[in-house]
Amino acid sequence: MKLLVVESPAKAKTIKGYLDDEFEVLASIGHFRDLPEKGMGIEENEDFSVKKWEVDNKKIDPIIKTIKKSDEIFLALDPDREGELIAWHLIEICKEKKLTDNRSFKRIEFSAIRKEDIISAIKHPREINQNLVNAAITRRFLDRFFGYKISPITKRRTIFGNSAGRVQSPTLKILCEKEKEIDLFIEKEYWELDITLNDKQNNNISCDLVSISNKKFDKLSLENKVQAEKLKEKISNSKFLVDNIVKREKQRQPYSPYSNSLLLQDASSKLGFSPKYTNALAQQLKDGDGLGGLGALITYHRTDSNRMKKSEVLKLRELISSSIGKNYVSEKEIIYKEKSKFVQQGHEAVTPTQLKRKPEDIKNKLSPDQYKLYDLIWKRTIASQMKPSKSLETLYYLKSDEFILKASGSIKTFDGFKKIYNFSDGKDDSQTLPNLEKNEKLEVKKLDIKQNFTKPPNRYSEAGLIKKLEELGIGRPSTYVAIFTKLEKNSYINIKNKSLIPTGKGKILVKFLDGFFDKFVDYGFTADLEEQLDLITESKLNWKSTLNKFLEILNQTVDQVEKQSITQVIDKINENSSEILKEKDCRKCKDGKLTIKFAFSGPFVGCTNYSKDQNGCTYSHALGENDENKDLSGDGKFIGIDNETKQKIFLKVGRYGRYLETLLDDGKAKRTSIPKKMKNEEIDIDKSIKLLSLPRKIGEHPESKKLITASIGPYGPYLKHDNKYVSLKEDDVTEIGINRAVELIDKNIKSKQDILIGEHPSTKKKIVQKKGIKGRPDYLSYNKKNFSIKDDMKEKKISLEEALKIIDEKISKKKEKRK
């Protein structure tokens, strides 16, 4: 028997259909052996030995069971460092279990799930590439050292910053530097000219102003309407003639096939897909499962290469010649230069597995989004070996006594690669110009002026940030999406309208790291580590020396930072926070200074006269992207007067967000939080009175006869019934009625009901299937102990037989450990 191991079940299913019955194909489902979840787990000595690798037995047991019945084991994990590491781990586990004798373990790789590629790979196996393994282990160890040494001190010195990462933190720094540019941006007014001239045939020609009195015109130089009107009058009264005519052929070269980063960027700009979604779709197209029997449609997608195999290039050129036309094939084979000098060996571009398989021919077997992505990949691949597009560009320079105008236009003469891949990027959009002669006279037909304002820099989108990371040499294709996910999960960024926006936590964390661990968030240092990993892959650098040097610098830095107090940390952050502390003096008490302060909920701006006994100044406002709430700081916004209490109501903002405040009869302040989804403009006097009157009684539950109330707590609006709480995600806490409240409560009760499975035959004690809280999976409860449920059982009611097996297995394992 022969066993072939891949990473995903979908890929295993597709490959199984290509092989003989003597082959069994199983999936590792990613990594199954890693550093322990808790603790460093690595000996800080010259060997960097691991105390104990943590193994996921659920993943590895079926593979080990099949290995015992197999003579040949083909390790067909992904053709990258991580795939090599998984293959190495499997062999190491087999060595520990003494399963390597009389069995051959062969490493094979293929970039596409094509039958011929798989058969060829099986015929040409290789040994495990220890250099790739060393690079993967080094990356994992670097990440562990960075996280486990810097994260704890980050938590101790900032209170809120619970996570730092080798690639994650420099990435966050990129976003924060862009946000600082935006915060410091000062808007500037300028006026724009829209000039249209007429020739003798009355043709309209749109022009741009180039120079005034032989000085280059700066479009930002018209700072107000008076200046614009004055210039408009001068140009309108001028007579123009054609001073110079420039005609030239312009070519647009085709684009290379996709690497992973280029695919993520293009799918975002052209299809509107997020990088995470694009990778998920590409995985489906690569694995081939669930595609109506089509098999794998594209090659390996987590690649940093844009090159194609020579044999595939020849097929592609023949296809262009036969199906599009001989005159569309490029004169000679186009060889694209790799963007990175450290592209992993064996990697190829993301291309269709079968070039002749046109998107429209298989459209009915794909989902709409699968089709769109395949169509994009197919067109880009076909276009990569086609001729350039050509156009004739014409420039007219039009001169008066004082001004020079320029009119430009172009005419397409040959569509070339754009016949297939014709996505407009705006670069070729231009007017069609009439034929003008030298010294021909033209008159101003229309001249409009328009007020404009300079705009701050755009925030990064996920695709834009990937491009920036690639330019800086930070991260690799397999890590990009994971970086964004982790930053968002840790509340360091928010993603709104496709823009990545640092939160207050993210901004101050970067200031702390940049102030005290500056080398470790330096782009050059991070990129150099990536290069070192690539050099380890090529056997040009010893992996242990990389770890030793990194640890030496890291340990020295940690020792220095440990000596800094929180006060010293805050002082240094204040020095580098001009964009946050634009106001120096407290607007409430007038004699205090504004400073950044730390809390478990995150950083905030407060007054130096603040004291915990509430006798000092209470001014504060949260940090974050919600700059529109800064005006609510201090005294806040006056909403109106409550006719019943005759007290003023103010809308304010503090470190925990927005709230309403009024005074009670005894002079004490009464406050209530504002639901996050409620906009400031919705909060009028009536809404304010209703919010301040919370909690409110809604009525009795018809079955329990117990009171239902509505209120707002630290986690938002909620219903309370029978000492249990139900979150209000969509409903208005001030308006929800009894019928809707009962509906939500009953739904919540039903979703959390325990299921009695039965009694244990030995002890006669009950076995109950319980619902996990806060999105956690279900579990079994028996004899006052909890038992995890296997992944494939989480969505169904468990039988008594299955429950007994889970419980007895866990109890027996514990007994074995005691021995």
Where are these regions (language model features)?
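Conserved short loop/turn motifs at secondary-structure junctions
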Residues: M1, D78-D80, I159-G161, K247-S256, ...
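C-terminal or mid-to-C-terminal helical accessory/interaction module adjacent to the motor/catalytic core
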Residues: I113-I195, R248
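Glycine-centered, phosphate/nucleic-acid-interacting loop/turn motifs that mediate DNA/RNA or nucleotide
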Residues: D289, A296, S491
